Amino acid sequence: MSTSATNGTHYEQLHQGRTKMYKSKVDVVLGAQWGDEGKGKVVDMLASDVDIVCRCQGGNNAGHTVVANGTEFDFHLLPSGVVNEKCVSVIGNGVVIHLPSLFDEVLKNEAKGLQHLENRLIISDRAHLVFDFHQHVDGMQEAEKGGKSLGNGVVIHLPSLFDEVLKNEAKGLQHLENRLIISDRAHLVFDFHQHVDGMQEAEKGGKSLGTTKKGIGPAYSSKATRNGIRVGELLGDFNLFSEKFKSIVATHVRLFPSINVDVEAELARYKDYADKVRPYVKDTICFLHTALRNGKTILVEGANAAMLDIDFGTYPYVTSSNCSIGGVLTGLGLPPQTIGEVIGVVKAYTTRVGDGPFPTEQLNDIGDLLQTRGFEIGVTTKRKRRCGWLDIPLLKYTSLVNGYTCICVTKLDILDTLPEIKVAVAYKKPNGEKLDHFPGTIAELGSIEVEYAVLPGWQTSTEDVRNFKELPENAQSYVRFLESELSVPVRWVGVGKGRESIINVH
């Protein structure tokens, strides 16, 4: 056999080995609008059949509500999959973690019945920490901007995580210690990150981006400028951790002289947190790749949503991380070929929290009705959400970026009382010319006119329907219209709060 033939065979063998090295795929659930689409409920439904559920980006600035066995759990850092005692939950390296918030979240959910997280929660050693001063600066920056709010942002605030766990354990969530995993590469959010977060917002004076003041932006800023502190460093030589902590505090004090950080008290607190978080931490990259090679099923729960992505959202009214499909890869250390289904979650109308452009917003009785019937209050911010009609150009854009393989439409029942329903089908320039792309700047988006299609309502309750064919004909037509416009199949339709209210269309 010639050398070239031998080399060709060797290449083919290696190539086939690389393409077939994984026995399973990673399915991803992403918000297709500005958040609050109901991703947590979809993840809760799908998590009953998977081995591992992951968070890959953001921090405790995003909120999910999951109803399980009649108990309502609120999650901010914890993946929604923790309610399933049979699966492991992973907080990946792309998350920023405020440890006080993490522990607070654990405690609150333990009080709701969530148990044994130490056996089923894994935190990446590469995740960055959010400190309290990050949160203080966050508020300062927001205040500086003056009024306008940017919305929302995984980095881990450990106190918040454990508080969330405790609260949900009290509601019945059990055995988390066996099924929650946090990446050892996830960054930590410290209390000072949160302090800084508020300061930065305040200093901006006029325009406000609507930070949740959880320190997410400042923590990602620390990460990007390479002076952030990761979970793994907290668990290593504490003297080295102390030196880095003092250095990062000094940097923030120089930038924001009004922040006050009791360094020694914080170090004592984090020495205690190190012992508390240690059982959860490991190399999540190795863990996930081993799981895929062994055929384990993995589900990724996206935080925030596509239109809040720092690159593809309505910048600057966005969060500080990539919450589109790319963030899944970088936030968990996965290659593209591991991605399977990409599920876009679409609310049957559109909402957003805080300021920023919103082409289909209804500042009228329709908006009030959607807000009231949909109980559109932010889980994290407690602010009323702005409401408007479904926006097809926006959804086409986020589908383009994320490559949805199917869609779940949620909260269809909120439209039950309307005699007619509008859907945005095109954007027009002021001269009447239709746009063939989604505007890339706030100025351009603010100048567009919206063209609507008017569809008949059904004025019948859908809350108790559990079969797609039993939905009112006009409700079915509404779903099919969305499917046709996006050229993406609708796989599920939600008509209520619990997982049992999600209808399998096919």
Swiss-Prot record:
Binding site for IMP: D36, E37, G38, K39, N61, A62, G63, H64, T212, R226, N304, T319, R383
Keyword line: Cytoplasm, GTP-binding, Ligase, Magnesium, Metal-binding, Nucleotide-binding, Purine biosynthesis
Name this protein carries in UniProt: Adenylosuccinate synthetase
GO cellular component, one term: cytoplasm
GO biological process: 'de novo' AMP biosynthetic process; IMP metabolic process
Active site: D36 (proton acceptor), H64 (proton donor)
Subcellular location: Cytoplasm
Pathway per the UniProt entry: Purine metabolism; AMP biosynthesis via de novo pathway; AMP from IMP: step 1/2
Pfam families (alphabetical): Adenylsucc_synt
GO molecular function, one term: magnesium ion binding
Co-factor note (free text): Binds 1 Mg(2+) ion per subunit.
PROSITE patterns xref list: ADENYLOSUCCIN_SYN_1 (PS01266), ADENYLOSUCCIN_SYN_2 (PS00513)
PANTHER family reported for this sequence: ADENYLOSUCCINATE SYNTHETASE
Record-listed GTP binding positions: 35-41, 63-65, 385, 411-413, 494-496
Residues annotated for Mg(2+) binding in this entry: D36, G63
Residues involved in substrate binding: V379, T380, T381, K382, R383, K384, R385
Chief location bin: cytoplasm
